[in-house]
Curated annotation (Swiss-Prot):
It catalyses: a purine 2'-deoxy-D-ribonucleoside + phosphate = a purine nucleobase + 2-deoxy-alpha-D-ribose 1-phosphate. Homotrimer. A purine D-ribonucleoside binds at residues 189, 231. Belongs to the PNP/MTAP phosphorylase family. The purine nucleoside phosphorylases catalyze the phosphorolytic breakdown of the N-glycosidic bond in the beta-(deoxy)ribonucleoside molecules, with the formation of the corresponding free purine bases and pentose-1-phosphate. Cleaves guanosine, inosine, 2'-deoxyguanosine and 2'-deoxyinosine. The gene is punA. It comes from Mycobacterium leprae (strain TN). This is Purine nucleoside phosphorylase.
Length: 268
């Protein structure tokens, strides 16, 4: 359901109002966006108070990428009312950035002060393993685009909040941190591009997250970013890359990553 001519903030408020009506909850204080391979983790987050297609909300578009169910769930985790967005849309699907970040803006309008962004990522370090979770410490926005229009000079010094990363690390001390590089996609990177990204300081590479982070920070929310390493990037293993292995890695890790995510959120 799209309303392309409305002010983005007004559209987010309308969608948030519908969420309140559909769930019976006026304020969700945490929101989670589940990326490629993460949707299987929904069951481990807890029982849902309400489940419905995101596309039934004003301004939302059904995701087309495999592994993105396009559902919205309302879940209670500890003391928190949590909005779970199972799947996202991507710029490479042909969508304008205002549509890509609309779910995050809606979550903020629905009361979320913490946004948890998850994704599937290629690991750029040889010591990384498929199935490993990595906390995003910072990002490189190599898409060259921003979801903000106008004089919105948002500070991104602490884009991925140190406080939340510490809470996550306290929950699971084995978690490591890394810099996430966002590429436009949908093609995977070449080995030469991977070598370049490593020289730039990147540890992870993917095709999402950074625009949502910018939108969330502009709305005053804190962000925790978590990448699931679903493959080692081009040129590291010598094997070709494909999306099926991304989904397989997520499915294999579903219960573990879902339970860990719930434990982290309970500490917020």
């Amino acid at each position: 359901m799209t309303y392309t001519l409305l002010d983005p903030d007004e559209l987010a408020r309308r969608a948030a109002q519908v969420i309140g009506e559909r769930t019976g909850i006026l304020k969700h204080d945490v929101a989670v966006v589940l990326g490629s391979g993460w949707s299987s983790a929904v069951a481990a987050l807890g029982s849902s108070r309400a489940v419905f297609p995101q596309a039934e909300l004003p301004g939302f578009i059904t995701p087309n990428a495999a592994g993105h169910t396009g559902e919205l769930l309302s879940v209670r985790i500890g003391a928190h009312r949590v909005l779970v967005l199972a799947g996202r849309i991507h710029p490479y699907e042909g969508h304008d950035l205002r549509h890509v970040v609309h779910p995050v803006r809606t979550a903020c309008a629905a009361g979320a002060r913490i946004i948890v962004l998850t994704n599937a990522a290629g690991g750029l370090r040889a010591d990384m393993a498929v199935g490993q979770l990595v906390l995003i410490s910072d990002h490189l926005n190599l898409t060259t685009r921003s979801p903000l229009v106008g004089t919105h000079f948002v500070d991104l010094t602490n884009a991925y909040t140190t406080r939340l990363r510490k809470l996550a690390s306290d929950t699971d001390p084995t978690l490591t941190e890394g810099v996430y590089a966002a590429q436009p996609g949908p093609h995977y990177e070449t080995p030469a591009e991977i070598r370049m990204l490593r020289m730039l300081g990147a540890d992870l590479v993917g095709m999402s997250t950074v625009h949502e982070t910018i939108a969330a920070r502009a709305a005053g929310a804190e962000v925790l970013g978590v990448s699931l390493v679903t493959n080692l990037a081009a040129g590291i293993t010598g094997k070709p890359l494909n999306h099926a292995e991304v989904l397989a890695a997520g499915t294999a890790s579903a219960n573990r990553i879902g339970s860990l995510l719930a434990d982290i959120i309970a500490r917020f």
